[in-house]
């Protein structure tokens, strides 16, 4: 996300680090972010400028969600999730803190207008979609307990959206 933000000149968008991956069943899969950051051009140079600071310096994703939601107007936030559900599940379970006297579910209900999630496969219920199977309990918690409308962009929609890498590089 940071890489894309910087690519498009949006350098000040804060990035939270995932620290809650206890239920992940996909620890053997290489981190997608690392794969993208290691991409090279035809001359063997990094395709993207590397991060100025390591992930260890990023704020915890749940705390960042709480901080940003607490500052937001009521029902003004659209959250778009294009990955696993563990951060959103942990946000729902979060307790009051210095950012807000509300628990996570209350804070989401007050500040979030909708959640848009890239997950699942509607045409084939037996398909093991990557964003879901990585942490099934977290995904179930989000779909069961999220207090605002959820809009799902399923696998079969995403697989039809082909975007040329050349355009990302040149446009």
Placement of each model-derived feature along the sequence:
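N-terminal acidic, glycine/proline-rich low-complexity segments
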Residues: 1-171
